[in-house]
Amino acid sequence: GLKALLASKGVSDHDMAELGLIAIPEDRSRRPHDFFRDRVMIPIMDKAGRVIAFGGRIMGDGQPKYLNSPETPLFNKRRVLYNLNNARDRAFAARNIIVCEGYMDVIALDKYGFGYAVAPLGTALTEDQIAEAWKVCPEPTLCFDGDGAGIRAAIRSIDRGLPILKAGYSLKYVFLPDKMDPDEFLKAHGHDAFLQHLQDTTPLVKLLWRKNTEGRVFDTPEQKALIEKNVMEEVAKIADEKVRGYYQQEMQNYIYNELGRGFWKNKRRESNDASGFRNSYRRTENRGQSAVPAAARPKVSMDELVLKFVLAAMVFYPELIAEYEERMGMFDISNAKLRR
């Protein structure tokens, strides 16, 4: 094993243990053993290409499936991105860097021509690792499996990334379909399909909104107020004053458009559905069934038509009256029937 090989080269048990290559039992009567026994070892390098640790994948069905070197004087896993030493120049050329969930994802992407991929090492993406990625690309692409674990990892990255956002530097996201990891997706769909996903990313600001609203019901004022409170509390964590201000504006836009005007969106959708019925009715008229002569139809002005729609909305949705009462006063209601 590795221990025997290193011992034959004069490396002491103490040095091997300090580098995380062997484990020394607390019971000194037991012999030290290889930390990565029965595992495929993957070298982890620093930015200069020097080996500072190892990752190990189990051969067989044992647990844990993946194992990294313990932290040592050379290796702090919160600061290191796997493959950054190889990916850096390629990322500069591609003007992008892909941050995956693990080093096996990076290996798969490299095999299919995406040599600008990196990954954290057994932890959620940290602030230090985001800062390292920003040195290469101001808006890294974070690639996650489309399963529950991938979504949870994405949410954790939002929590880590928000406080350190700064002008010109952010994160964008891509989620692979059908709960696939990059290796599975590339085997099934190939290089071009993955490249297409990279061109259809979700910006952090939009994912922050989705994090707080997706799958939730907000059809009462109290629920809407809670969503606004939660979103604004998260935005308040952004340290950069300018970026925080723009995020507040963007969230207010989401609140106005998706919480305040959802009613009007639904009305437009219903109107589009109704237009299909009207077109069908007109085709029936053209066949001579129940056609009404044009001269017999009453002429209605556009202003009166708009007013009818507004009044109908107020009848069916009286909660809108208080919100739009002042604007309603601006209408000139000359039609006696409508005034009543």
Regions found by a protein language model. Give the residues of each.
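Phosphate-handling DNA/RNA-contact segment within nucleic-acid enzymes
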Residues: 2-140, 153-154
